[in-house]
């Protein structure tokens, strides 16, 4: 199914059409929302979702975008979830840490989706599009969680995304998040990496920097459809 065909079938889903709003005009009715997940492995169907963060994107009166609001949750593994020891070693997540204070997948996803729907309404957008660094990985885990819980109101487009690894490769010649941030002049602390919150906020800075740089270069103007 093409993106346009999906949009036609879901025209009214997700909040107020309003292409007059500058954010809706900039991204064809989509609201970029940056997402990062930390997981128990690479398989979204079998491996645990352990952390998830999302950053909604705002736009100022000049048409420049900025990271607006962060949502972050440590997540309890779903029943029967696989967790690879190598994944925990890589992320540094300690499941038994007394301050981990994890919530269920349902709580995490519902709270994030509620915030995203609020941002959709505020920006006159009909649907969110996931922004991620290697976005297909994050989108796969979001979609798997939605399917596990049989959630009916997923504000994210099910297959379209903006990948900052690709965008940063184009803009800066770097595809690794830390190196792309360095090339973009964004501070990046490797000791904080592989926290969903930290990586999401840095990815949001990177995405906004690329979009704004393109605007400054005259690469986008607000044309009516």
Swiss-Prot record:
Annotated residues for binding of Mg(2+) 2: 36, 38, 194, 199
SUPFAM superfamilies found in the cross-reference section: Ribonuclease H-like
Ligand binding (Mg(2+) 1): 36
EC class of the enzyme, as a word: hydrolase
Single Gene Ontology BP annotation: tRNA processing
Physiological role: Trims short 3' overhangs of a variety of RNA species, leaving a one or two nucleotide 3' overhang. Responsible for the end-turnover of tRNA: specifically removes the terminal AMP residue from uncharged tRNA (tRNA-C-C-A). Also appears to be involved in tRNA biosynthesis.
UniProt protein name: Ribonuclease T
Organism: Pseudomonas savastanoi pv. phaseolicola (strain 1448A / Race 6) (Pseudomonas syringae pv. phaseolicola (strain 1448A / Race 6))
